[in-house]
Regions:
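A positional/architectural concept
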Residues: 52-56
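Exposed, interaction-prone extracellular/peripheral surfaces
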Residues: 2-48, 64-69, 78, 87-100, ...
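N-terminal low-complexity, intrinsically disordered segments
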Residues: 72-82
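Structured adenosyl-cofactor binding patch, chiefly the S-adenosyl-L-methionine
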Residues: 126-129
Length: 310
């Protein structure tokens, strides 16, 4: 049974994705959307400033120096060779590489109310992919779960889009793997991304960032130096707050690793630990000047965006 967002954008099962779900976001490709929730660094940043990097500038040609030209763009090698001052001319890049890092690892295979975080992540990645295609930019990225990874070099038009959507469908699994592969950690994928990206790229990181640590932060610093990064955190309400009945009764929890109980009154400790964990994630991106947008798996994706007034 499909859960209709609006128009023809469906969530089918909520535990995995099918290609037609992701293709349906074509109808949103021309909308100038903004997340309803402000980015964390905009709310908390203080003295940290976000880096705003526009499209890169490509070298076009060299011409004779003219009065008023910026001396910083004089081509000194041509000037020395010809004996006359020459200036470099640049134009804005016609297309820009866009990379999406899509985390579908085991911690993302969770959802308490609407869909799994992994499913919501795929829908968000699809929305960003379609808008990338609409702008005429090239799309590449990395899609990974706990045992597999797809590394996609940027391609233009529909080729980059369809490859990315296909890999998203294939790697979005219904249940966690019984044996996890440490070589597919977030840190490993960020290192892979640092080798894949091209200077001046736009990068979208889609994850719950449960594996974010100091080593990841060092790699982010390197990537962020010459690129524009947006971080998208996918979360579920149960990760932040236990159900109300857990305040008075024991709450049984089951997983592949076993089962157990939350003791009565454990809700406060659980909430405090969750808040501390979230604060660390927020602070990591604040220090990097990277916008952190928050998307919840308990609501349809498009309800978490709005079209800004012109």
């Amino acid at each position: 049974m499909s859960i209709a967002l609006f128009d023809n954008t469906p969530y089918r099962t909520g535990v995995d994705v099918q290609l037609n779900e992701l293709l349906s976001y074509k109808q949103q490709e021309k909308l100038q959307l903004q997340p309803t929730a402000k980015a964390a660094y905009q709310q908390l940043a203080g003295n940290y400033l976000a880096k705003i990097k526009g499209r890169g500038m490509e070298f076009a040609e060299v011409r004779h120096y003219q009065p008023g030209d910026d001396v910083r763009i004089i081509d000194w090698s041509v000037t020395a060779r010809t004996g006359k001052a020459h200036t470099k001319l640049f134009h804005e890049e016609k297309e820009r590489p866009v990379f999406i890092l899509l985390d579908l690892s085991d911690s993302m295979i969770f959802g308490s109310q609407f869909v799994f975080k992994s499913v919501q992540a795929c829908h968000l990645a699809s929305l960003l992919s379609w808008q990338t295609k609409q702008r005429g930019d090239r799309l590449g990225g990395i899609v990974f779960n706990q045992q597999q990874v797809a590394e996609l070099k940027p391609r233009g038009r529909s080729k980059g889009l369809m490859r990315f959507l296909h890999e998203s469908e294939q790697l979005c699994v219904k249940q966690p793997f019984k044996q996890s592969d440490a070589s597919q950690s977030l840190l490993v994928q960020l290192k892979r991304l640092s080798r894949l990206v091209q200077t001046g790229s736009q990068i979208h990181l889609i994850s719950d960032f449960s594996q974010l640590d100091d080593a990841c932060q060092k790699i982010l610093t390197l990537i962020n130096r010459h690129n524009q990064i947006n971080a998208w955190q996918i979360s579920d309400p149960l990760e932040q707050l236990l159900p109300q009945h857990a305040l008075k009764n024991q709450l049984q929890v089951n997983s592949l690793q076993g089962s157990g109980f939350f003791k009565r009154g454990a809700s406060k400790d659980y909430q405090d630990a969750a808040s501390l964990r979230q604060q660390k994630i927020d602070n990591t991106f604040i220090k990097q000047g990277i916008p952190l947008y928050k998307v919840c798996a308990s609501l349809p994706l498009m309800e978490q965006f709005h079209v800004p007034a012109r």
